[in-house]
Amino acid sequence: RDAQESRGLGDVYKRQEYAYGSILVECEGTLEYPHAELLGFTVAEEALTVNGVKMPLEELYKANTEKFAAVYPDKGRNSAEVMTSAPAPKTFVYPGEAVETPVVYIPVFPGTNCDYDTAKAFRAAGAEVRTSVLCNIAGDDVLRSIAEMKEHIRRAHIFVLAGGFSAGDEPDGSAKFIVNVLNNKDIRDEIHALTDRGGLILGICNGFQALVKSGLLPYGRLGMVTKESPTLFRNDVNRHISQIVSTRVATTASPWLRGFRPGELHSIAVSHGEGKFVVSEELARELFANGQVAFQYADAAGNPTAEAPWNPNGSSYAIEGIISQNGLILGKMGHTERYENNLFKNIAGNKQQSLFANAVAYFRKVQ
């Protein structure tokens, strides 16, 4: 941005009349308003020019971060290898009667904080959304909540685990509370019945952690977790990260991924402390061979990458999301639900990732 010569940013901030409640406006032309002051102009060049001094953004970022990088790193350890695959496309047809308004069920656990956004995204796509709160004040509350949850799953077409920090990510790790609920026999039986009848399951962020740690991903069934199973672990930078990432479509072998093209890129919000997908090389090769890797973190050129900041948590083989082998279950770290019109307007790329519309189309049997 070029600061105006006669009245730069520094001048405005030094003036006594500057106060809280002032509004910074970005507009196409000069505002015809008596109290509006022109501060500068946007330019294509990646630099700030203030009082005639040009400062490249890259140098400013380096100066802002490198002094404390040893204590507050913005990059973790880069893994050496990245895999890719080119799975054959698949067609998915819902085995039941066409449903114009599929029912989505979102359980709200202690610590869930993305249920409103997720519900709004599904409603915008044409689904009916039902929620229930899992109350854990007393033992009877838990039992009553689980019974209610069981009935909701039985009547749902889509089961969704939204993002958040269930039970504060305690004890010592994310999603353990949700996993215990999923492994309740009544809940487990209803979830298996849901997928057996062609229903869909989605887990985002904390929900993805629960799907992986319960065995629903990548195995498609609860109770199949072993010491060789993948997991989600603390980010390499050892702290919470919040940014926009570029993710690359790696497969279309799921109703959730209907209409996507392998290699297609999306700009997606991420916000998590434990988003590093950890998997052995042997199992990773199996996931890629099966076409179960849904999305990978991508660099500026659109290629899967192990390097920060594009792969912000250090995920193995750049994996951001995976699907079950039958394609009915999808889990991912990126918050697809957080985008809507007029958000992230200063972010480049395709921010509309049509997972929710794809799920509704599957039940409507749209060809």
Language-model features: locations:
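Phosphate/diphosphate-binding loops
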Residues: D11-Y61, K185, D189-D196
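N-terminal beta1-alpha1 cap of cysteine-dependent amidohydrolase-like domains
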Residues: V50-I204, F208-Y219, F233-I241, S316, ...
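Generic beta-strand/beta-sheet core signal
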Residues: S6-R7, E26-E28, L39-T42, P107-F109, ...
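A short alpha->loop->secondary-structure connector
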Residues: P218-E228
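Single conserved hydrophobic/aromatic residue that forms the stacking wall/gate
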Residues: D2-L9, Y13
